[in-house]
Regions:
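Active-site acidic/histidine proton-transfer and metal-coordination neighborhood
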Residues: 12, 26-119, 128, 195
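Hydrophobic faces of well-ordered beta-strands that scaffold small-molecule active sites
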Residues: 17-22, 54-56, 92-94, 119-122, ...
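Aromatic-lined substrate-binding rim segments of carbohydrate-active enzymes
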Residues: 2-14
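Active-site beta-loop-alpha junctions enriched in small/polar residues
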Residues: 22-27, 59-61, 97-99, 122-126, ...
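Histidine-acidic metal/acid-base catalytic patches
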Residues: 11, 87, 105-109, 113-120, ...
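Aromatic- and glycine-enriched glycan-recognition loops and surfaces
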Residues: 1-4, 34, 166
Length: 211
């Protein structure tokens, strides 16, 4: 409601907003027109703040499961959003997510065979969805502009380096392959201390990134 206040706060704290995440009802055609209006407003506000990445998640799961036509509609509507974002100088990437129409490796392949949208791999969501995160990243490397780094232990998201995901191998692969995009660290619903999670994740990353 107060963009100037937010801009002032970001300036005072030397903080930058790297990306915005949004989901939508992509497969329900009538509902999507309202959703697209909302997303366009979000993109226009992002442009004012110089925010680089729009992360798109979701895609509803029907009560009886999704059908092939749903993925075609999802792909078409993602392309509409990506094109509008591109016109505003913003990179739109799709983020496979638990509890959505695209969470398994097979669903990721199905969607990406229908659209050229960029890929935002959330490492822990890829693994929790039954995938090999490194193999999916290698497979769709040319689509990747933005990475969500997250660790997983059992069914809980944990600070980087405390889970069972081979993050070191993934980070080294991307760096050695010349990845020059952006990285974001996040932990969904962590039950521990937030400050500790940030500190532990930062220390983990120090071995890969120079200050």
């Amino acid at each position: 409601d107060s963009p100037e206040k937010l801009k002032a706060y970001l300036s005072e704290t030397n903080t930058k907003i790297l990306g915005i995440y949004t989901g939508a009802n992509y497969i329900y055609t009538d509902a999507f027109e309202d959703e697209f209006f909302r997303i366009k407003k979000t993109i226009e506000n992002m442009e004012k703040f110089g925010i680089k990445h729009l992360v798109l998640g979701g895609g509803a799961i029907r009560a009886n499961g999704n059908v092939e036509e749903d993925y075609k509609i999802l792909a078409k509507n993602l392309d509409r959003v990506a094109q509008f974002a591109k016109e505003k100088g913003i990179i739109a990437s799709y983020h496979p997510h638990l509890g959505s129409a695209v969470e398994t490796p097979e669903q990721i392949d199905q969607l990406f065979s229908l659209t050229n949208i960029s890929f935002c791999p959330d490492i822990a969501h890829l693994v929790a969805g039954g995938g090999d995160a490194l193999e999916l990243i290698k497979k769709y490397r040319q689509r990747i502009e933005y990475v969500h780094l997250k660790d997983l232990k059992g069914s809980e998201f944990v600070p980087l380096g405390e889970g069972n995901i081979p993050l070191e191998e993934i980070i080294r692969y991307l760096k050695e392959d010349g990845f020059s995009g952006d990285w974001l660290v996040e932990i969904d619903g962590y039950s521990g201390d937030s400050y500790y999670a940030c500190e532990a994740s930062y220390k983990f990353l120090e071995q890969f990134f120079k200050k």
